[in-house]
UniProtKB/Swiss-Prot annotation:
Record protein name field: Enoyl-[acyl-carrier-protein] reductase [NADH]
Organism field: Xylella fastidiosa (strain 9a5c)
Gene it is expressed from: fabV
Family, similarity comment: Belongs to the TER reductase family.
Residue positions of the active site: 236 (proton donor)
Pathway annotation: Lipid metabolism; fatty acid biosynthesis
EC number: 1.3.1.9
InterPro entries xref list: Eno_Rdtase_FAD-bd_dom (IPR024906), Enoyl-CoA_Rdtase_cat_dom (IPR024910), FabV-like_NADH_b (IPR050048), Trans-2-enoyl-CoA_reductase (IPR010758)
Annotated residues for binding of NAD(+): 48-53, 74-75, 111-112, 140-141, 245, 274-276
Assembly, per entry: Monomer.
NCBIfam families attached to this UniProt entry: EnoyACPredFabV, PRK13656.1
Family matches, as Gene3D superfamilies: NAD(P)-binding Rossmann-like Domain
Pfam family, one: Enoyl_reductase
Alphabetical UniProt keywords: Fatty acid biosynthesis, Fatty acid metabolism, Lipid biosynthesis, Lipid metabolism, NAD, Oxidoreductase
Enzyme class: oxidoreductase
Length: 401
């Protein structure tokens, strides 16, 4: 079929398998250009491995350190009539490239919040990966979670706490600056958001892996977070999602105390703002990203997901000098350090106040934001012929759960 982008709100409803594959190949090339190191992770489990930071970290571990990787995700394959999700094509492209490079790659498609998934992962670690993993990456961003004990569905919300929040935002369909009003979360919504996006599931994973004795000595685990800046704090860090991320921090401290007994440790890694399917859904964030990208590009500080993942593994968790990573007062690895530089944020605040419909494309990197967003789904690549016939049914070595 011939596939062109179709967008609805902050979602692109079509995906391009060839474009997605090329996106993955581009990230692999970026990691390979930094050279392969041997003093790093050997056997890696990535929970949430099909897009964004999870995919980038899987690429960095495999192609930057030669690691065996097991990836868990929840994606839809394409059919004769309909393309699959971008994550399906990303995972397929990773698997193909890893196997071509002689690397061990295993993938499981299913609900990462379920006990069945944990059992399957443990079974594969024992039967195929030598019985242990030494790095567990937790990178789930989900709007809902089915509680493994009760089967109840909890949903996360992107809402402030206490009072409604009014902010500048972009209507990405009309390319217009709008005033977005977001009503505050209820107590139940806050609790449910913590249940979905907090540290509970990460801890269940580490508990299960510990009890099954599949964590190697010196195992590290990392979960991803975002703090952002004053511009986004009301909706994010000071909102329902911020409560979930605070729960993630508390979980990290508990897990770290336990893993230190094995000579390992746990950290939350705070990452920079990037264009992902998750960030596109957060009011005010696309406009802020369009501004901060312009500022960081002008200062030579810009990074995408793969550059962040490479820096996380090479300069934080697995430093060449063998020293422990620098952490903040909450024991977090900060990879938003360049974004939060005073000079960067001061410029962002000035532009935030000045931006209008008339100067949106001049003052910000909004044109590239739109391009980067469509690129997530395999579009806007100069090396892909989008009028060519393409097969949406892509198969690969994946266990369906």
């Amino acid at each position: 079929m011939i596939i062109h982008p179709k967008t609805r709100g902050f979602i692109c409803t079509t995906t391009h398998p060839v474009g997605c594959e090329y996106n993955v190949l581009e990230q692999i090339q970026s990691t390979r250009a930094r050279g392969v190191r041997s003093n790093g992770p050997k056997k890696v489990l990535v929970i949430g491995a099909s897009s964004g930071y999870g995919l980038a970290t899987r690429i960095s571990a495999a192609f930057g350190f030669g690691a065996d990787t097991l990836g868990v995700f929840f994606e839809k394959p394409g059919t004769e009539k309909k393309p699959g999700t971008a994550g399906w094509y990303n995972a397929a492209a990773f698997d193909k490239s890893a196997k071509n490079a002689g690397l061990y790659s295993r993938s499981i498609n299913g609900d990462a919040f379920s006990d069945e998934m944990r059992a399957k992962v443990i079974e594969i670690i024992k039967s195929e990966m030598g019985g242990h993993v030494d790095l567990v990456v937790y990178s789930l961003a989900s709007p809902l979670r089915k509680m493994p004990s009760t089967g109840e569905i909890k949903r996360s919300v992107l809402k402030p706490i206490g009072v409604a929040h009014i902010s500048n935002a972009i209507d990405t369909n009309k390319d217009q600056i709008i005033q977005a009003t977001v009503e505050p979360a209820t107590e139940q919504e806050i609790a449910d958001t913590v249940a979905v996006m907090g540290g509970q599931d990460w801890e269940l994973w580490i508990n299960a892996l510990t009890q099954a004795d599949v964590l190697a000595p010196q195992t590290r685990t990392v979960a991803f977070s975002y703090i952002g800046t004053e511009i986004t704090w009301p909706i994010y860090w000071h909102g329902a999602l911020g409560k979930a991320k605070a729960d993630l921090d508390a979980t990290s401290r508990r897990l770290d105390a336990r893993l230190q007994a094995l000579g390992g440790g746990a950290n939350v890694a705070v990452l920079k703002s990037v264009v992902t399917q998750a960030s596109a859904a957060i009011p005010a964030l696309p406009l802020y990203i369009a501004i901060v990208f312009k500022v960081m590009k002008e200062k030579g500080l810009h990074e995408g997901t793969i550059e962040q993942a490479d820096r996380l593994l090479r300069e934080r968790l697995y430093r060449e000098d063998g020293q422990p990573a620098a952490v903040d007062e909450e024991h977090r690895l900060r990879l938003d350090d360049w974004e939060l530089r005073e000079d960067v944020q001061a410029t962002c605040k000035v532009i935030w106040k000045q931006v209008t419909n008339e100067n949106l494309f001049q003052l910000t990197d909004y044109a590239n934001y739109k391009r980067d967003f469509l690129k997530l789904f395999g579009f806007e690549r100069a090396d892909v012929d989008y009028d060519a016939d393409v097969n949406p049914e892509v198969t690969f070595d994946v266990i369906e759960l």
